[in-house]
Amino acid sequence: MPLKSHEFTSESVAEGHPDKVADQISDAIVDLFLSKDPTSKVAVETLCTTNRVVLAGEVRTNNGSVVTPDEMNAAARAVVKKIGYEQDGFHWEKMAVENHVHGQSAEIAQGVEEGQGLFKEEGAGDQGIMFGYATDETPELMPATLVYSHQILQKLAELRHSGKNPQLEPDAKSQVTLQYEGSRPVGVNAVVVSHQHKAGVSQEELREVIRPVVKAVLPEGWFPPEEKFYVNPTGSFVIGGPDGDCGLTGRKIIVDTYGGAAPHGGGAFSGKDPSKVDRSAAYATRYLAKNIVAAGLATRCTIQVSYAIGVAQPLSIYVDTHGTGQADEARIAKAVRELFDLSPKGIRTHLKLSNPIYGPTAAYGHFGRIPGEGGTFTWEKTDLAGELKRLVN
């Protein structure tokens, strides 16, 4: 049977994109609370617009520690400064910061605290469905379209921060279209990069800056025809960031996950402590799907879980290997249940999610990253692959 030929596209946005500015500020607040109390409950949203940042949400600490509004506001400024915003319309030092963060609802608290609520175990912070995914089309076990989209913007950000190309400003987006034969990418059909720049920089100058970065990211010989290499297709892009578009936490959930190659349960990650299963269970299902693929049990794997607020264990676990499985999906699902405690406490303990590790997740994707010495991206480890393989086989 001939392999199905098709195109697929994913996009990414840079750290300076207004929605990513908001995500990074929200996660800086999460890290601030967890650094003082690892059991903190945090749900903080950020809005950023022309020289203004607004913080709102609900928080609670359990060990008597206090995070002041001034500390939260300073964390927001530090994020904007690190990104590099020093423009008239959005400047880390000049922007106003409004803080409307207040205490967590007692009714929510009783559902997520051990020993309280109808069920005495620590329950999920909300109901919902979460998905994890992995594919062997890249070493990261991620969709190639998204990997390349992220890497293009990461390299451009490194170039901007180095000072070697002062014409680049923080806001940027990328998009990569690949040609697939069956499940394998075989070439690039189009690349789009929209990058904010200083006034007076021509489109051709910008193309000459961006072209070598794109070429370095893509496999050799995959650079698209010039007419399919789009740089700032509307012309100039001087007004950008929160001065050009209002940014909000949680609006880039497909960029954050699998670039459209897998389902999404709808819940955003940034601004949430790990008692929120929107975040922690999505990390756990990625960890499990990645380990299933790393174990050679499938070349593609999607996992869905569901939760009820206040209930510890997931209501359902679904494993789909998309016809690539080397074992029955029911056996794989059974092994997952045996090897990994998918309660909020079990996830948090296994993946060490109570640490202040969330800042780096808020730009360039939560998945496909390298686990760090500081405990970041623990869900990207493949240390469960051997046990999974043994149990399934």
UniProtKB/Swiss-Prot annotation:
- Write down the InterPro entries for this protein, in alphabetical order: ADOMET_SYNTHASE_CS (IPR022631), S-AdoMet_synt_C (IPR022630), S-AdoMet_synt_central (IPR022629), S-AdoMet_synt_N (IPR022628), S-AdoMet_synthetase (IPR002133), S-AdoMet_synthetase_sfam (IPR022636)
Quote the PROSITE patterns the UniProt record gives: ADOMET_SYNTHASE_1, ADOMET_SYNTHASE_2
Name the principal localization, coarsely classed: cytoplasm
Q: Where is this region: Flexible loop?
A: 104-114
Residues annotated as binding ATP are H17, D171, A172, K173, D245, R251, K252, A268, K272
Listed binding positions for L-methionine are E58, Q104, D245, K276
The reaction(s) annotated as catalysed by this protein in its Swiss-Prot or TrEMBL entry are:
L-methionine + ATP + H2O = S-adenosyl-L-methionine + phosphate + diphosphate
Entry note: cofactor: Binds 2 divalent ions per subunit. Binds 1 potassium ion per subunit.
Q: What is this protein called?
A: S-adenosylmethionine synthase
Originating organism: Hyphomonas neptunium (strain ATCC 15444)
